């Protein structure tokens, strides 16, 4: 059975760069929300000798993640998941989108793929320093003084 590596946020950036480091004996599935970006990335990988496929997936939607899991398992045994999908304020992400994609999306990907992955398989969640450098619109600074009062 073929070994499958799923990379979320694979249409560009860290996801696509990570795909280029994977062994060429794996089937690579790049996911993201924009098929045109995924198709360009897939063409780039195929030129490098990879067997690669594109699948749109919104990681903030559990049903979309379940569809991705079904697609991935139809191609072989999922051995690796690189979860690099994410947004930041610099990408014009709203607080709601940041929470849905970066937090809930991570949980959905981990939970759904863990159901089908065997021992020895690996899920890697890629993050950024955004967890440590929160944008001002997320931090309720005006509420801090209220916390010191009765």
Feature map (PLM): residue ranges:
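Catalytic loop of short-chain dehydrogenase/reductase
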Residues: 87-92, 122-150
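A hydrophobic alpha-helix adjacent to the NAD(P)-binding/active-site core of NAD(P)-dependent oxidoreductases
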Residues: 98-99
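Conserved Rossmann-fold cofactor-binding substructure of NAD(P)-dependent oxidoreductases
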Residues: 60-75
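Hydrophobic positions on the long internal alpha-helix
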Residues: 68, 82, 109-113, 117
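Conserved glycine-rich Rossmann-like NAD(P)H-binding loop of the short-chain dehydrogenase/reductase
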Residues: 25-40
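Rossmann-fold cofactor-recognition segment
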Residues: 47-63
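Conserved glycine-rich cofactor-binding loop
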Residues: 9-12
């Amino acid at each position: 059975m073929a070994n499958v590596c799923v990379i979320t946020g694979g249409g560009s950036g860290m996801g696509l760069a990570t795909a280029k480091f994977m062994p060429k004996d794996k089937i690579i599935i790049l996911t993201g929300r924009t098929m045109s970006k995924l198709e360009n990335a897939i063409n780039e990988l195929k030129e490098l000798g990879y067997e690669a496929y594109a699948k749109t997936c919104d990681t903030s939607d559990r049903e979309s993640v379940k569809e991705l899991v079904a697609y991935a398992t139809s191609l072989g045994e999922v051995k690796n998941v690189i979860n690099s999908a994410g947004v930041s304020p610099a990408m014009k992400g709203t607080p709601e989108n940041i929470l849905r994609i970066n937090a809930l999306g991570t949980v959905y990907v981990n939970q759904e793929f863990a159901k089908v992955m065997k021992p020895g398989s690996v899920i890697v969640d890629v993050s950024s320093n955004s967890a440590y450098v929160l944008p001002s619109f997320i931090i309720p600074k005006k509420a801090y003084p209220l916390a010191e009062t009765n």
